[in-house]
Amino acid sequence: MKAVVLLSGGLDSSTALYKAKADGADCYAISFDYRQRHRQELDSAVAIAQSAQVTQHQIVAFDLTLWGGSALTDTQIDLPSRSIEEMADHIPVTYVPARNSIFLSFALAYAETISAEQVYIGVNQLDYSGYPDCRPDFIQAMQEVFRLGTKLGREGQAIEICTPLINLHKSAIIELGNDLGVPWEQTWSCYSDGGGSPPLACGQCDSCQLRLAAFAQLGLSDPLSYAT
């Protein structure tokens, strides 16, 4: 069984990759260089793909800074500073317009080309920043796109979108990753680029806060280095 796995280099996508491997899939990882602010994640994606010994790792490059619209693609927009409790109140400025639609479309084309049966994505609807494209109704709609928009789908063999983390809290994702052997020290969750050696995560953005809180909830130390 072949599976394309969306791999950002973050905690969730890395766990999704290791889950796909545990499920017996022959894994083809796909990452995206869209000129994002947090380019450190690409180095992490390469490291994770190597550690997981994927069959192939593709990095697709395109430029979403051409129109910006997000703090992750426009450095003139400040990263938000808010509490975890405030994260579900509204869609934040770190939302990249239609990002998962774009990513899944690339993954679908890749999967159909290599005759993969599945596409894994590490979206999560419980501990998240309020993004609309991490929710079950979005995934269900994209599954229909996979069915209707491909030769395989029209012939009755639609590529399946697998979301093994969608109903897990961040702490449960870490527990699963621990069981699967995910090398957390190679992952990168921060919305800033980290600069320096070793790179330092900011500790303040939504993603850092959720990650740190989950490790703390489990009584574990996050192996990443933080500026604060």
UniProtKB/Swiss-Prot annotation:
It is an enzyme of class 6 (ligase). InterPro entries: QueC (IPR018317), Rossmann-like_a/b/a_fold (IPR014729). CDD domains: QueC-like (cd01995). It catalyses: 7-carboxy-7-deazaguanine + NH4(+) + ATP = 7-cyano-7-deazaguanine + ADP + phosphate + H2O + H(+). Pathway: Purine metabolism; 7-cyano-7-deazaguanine biosynthesis. One of its GO terms (biological process) is queuosine biosynthetic process. Binds 1 zinc ion per subunit. Zn(2+) binds at residues 190, 202, 205, 208. ATP binds at residues 7-17. Catalyzes the ATP-dependent conversion of 7-carboxy-7-deazaguanine (CDG) to 7-cyano-7-deazaguanine (preQ(0)). This is 7-cyano-7-deazaguanine synthase. It comes from Acaryochloris marina (strain MBIC 11017).
